Structures are given as C-alpha cells and as structure tokens.
C-alpha cells in the first residue's frame, strides 16, 4: 500500500505497534482506534464495547497508567466492566461503570 501522509495516522500506527509489543492484552482487545474532532485518541474495546479516551498528548504514559489500573482491578473487574475510561488527565483514570 501507499505511505500514510497524515502525522496523526503515522502516530496511530506507531502507537498500535508499541501497544502490540508492550501491552498485548490491550492490543488483543482493541476493536477500533480513532481520532475525534479535537484530535484526541479514542480506543474502543471488543468487549462490551468500552470506550477509552486518551486525549492528545502523553498517550503512552496514559496507557501505562491504564495498565496499572487494570492490574489493580484484576480479579475483581475487567476494563470491559466500564462504559468508558477517561485517561485525558495525567496520572488518573475517570471510570464510569456499566449499569
């Protein structure tokens, strides 16, 4: 195929590669990755589908926070137990549980 010209598309491809190599459980559960009108990354999980809002900057750092959050809830809940996870704020997860 042709070479992706958009910086954000290239950034998305690099991010997906890094997730595949370093956070495989998340990679296996990604249904889609998109950018909203504010150029914020959004990941939708296969399960349920949970929406994860990552924002525009420090995406990998936010994914590391998400991975720690996932480890914390392991055995009690899964990421898919939440309707959405908002990672736009540094070092915190804003979570809305499914009803």
Language-model-detected regions and their locations in the chain:
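Charged, solvent-exposed interaction patches on well-folded alpha/beta domains
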Residues: 1-99
